[in-house]
């Protein structure tokens, strides 16, 4: 709490030193390619890919680009740092990268069951933990339908104007203090214990071909709660978002989304000799999860 010294005493010979924890996250280099031969590039299909263009390879190239973007997003969510590298394939210098779920499992608040399974009790217990971690007043809640329905039932069961939202002015600072903007973006909001929660569907956790099943929701994530606030550096005063995707760049060279084509005359690209046009995609990026102790990972019961 403090200290007291006798008159005429010397200065203390012990002192406190800041325990600074420096965290780093390796960048992930994500790549993809698509190839079309000269003959295929002149084939006409039945899909108008835009502007009256029916060349079928353009549709395939567009799909490849979208899959590349999806893969990059999955790496940012599901990535893990590598400790033991299998060197049998000649790869020795990949460190992996910490994805969002990995960061929350390691340093975030992790629920032991879906919120709302026990009514307001679950949410109240979480709010007490949020108080301990100095959490901001606004959160975005992205969840699977399974969790989303429980939250709807919890709010409905509590009774509007009684246990939930009562006496608390909902905060919409993340939406320029505009409730309609939140609604237009698909968010439904409720308040409890001084916190406002803006919830939305996490489509990735509902897609049955990706993470949309109960086993994933129990063992990995049924939802996340992201603080809608900036983290302030105490020395410089600079502000940075609680969740940020970074890309490498320097001197005008940017690796956020690199795209180039090589070919042996196909489609006018003459920097190769093979009778193909090859489309290349590359990105070097990482996810920064600041103040992970204020983020929430929602998991079900196995």
Name what the model sees in each region:
Residues 1-181, 187-189, 195, 201-209, ...:
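Flexible, glycine/threonine- and acidic-rich loop/arm segments that mediate assembly and lattice contacts
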């Amino acid at each position: 709490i403090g200290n007291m010294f006798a008159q005429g005493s010397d200065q203390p010979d012990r002192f406190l030193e800041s325990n600074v924890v420096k965290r780093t996250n390796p960048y992930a280099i994500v790549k993809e390619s698509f190839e079309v031969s000269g003959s295929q590039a002149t084939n006409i299909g039945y899909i108008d890919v835009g502007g009256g263009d029916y060349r079928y390879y353009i549709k395939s190239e567009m799909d490849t680009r979208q899959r590349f973007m999806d893969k990059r997003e999955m790496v940012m969510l599901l990535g893990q740092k590598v400790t033991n590298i299998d060197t049998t394939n000649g790869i020795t210098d990949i460190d992996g990268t910490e994805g969002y779920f990995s960061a929350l499992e390691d340093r975030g608040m992790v629920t032991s069951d879906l919120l709302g399974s026990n009514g307001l009790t679950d949410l109240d217990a979480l709010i007490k933990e949020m108080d301990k971690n100095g959490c901001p007043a606004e959160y975005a809640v992205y969840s699977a339908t399974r969790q989303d329905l429980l939250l709807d039932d919890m709010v409905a069961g509590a009774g509007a104007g009684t246990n939930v939202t009562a006496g608390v002015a909902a905060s919409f600072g993340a939406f320029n203090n505009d409730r309609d903007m939140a609604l237009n973006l698909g968010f439904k909001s409720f308040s409890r214990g001084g916190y406002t929660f803006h919830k939305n569907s996490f489509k990735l956790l509902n897609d049955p071909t990706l993470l949309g099943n109960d086993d994933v929701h129990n063992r990995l994530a049924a939802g996340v709660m992201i603080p809608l606030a900036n983290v302030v550096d105490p020395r410089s005063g600079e502000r940075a978002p609680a969740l940020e995707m970074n890309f490498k760049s320097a001197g005008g060279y940017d690796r956020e989304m690199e795209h180039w084509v090589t070919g042996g005359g196909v489609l006018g690209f003459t920097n190769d000799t093979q009778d193909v046009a090859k489309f290349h995609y590359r990105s070097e990026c990482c996810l920064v999860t600041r103040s992970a102790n204020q983020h929430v990972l929602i998991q079900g019961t196995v």
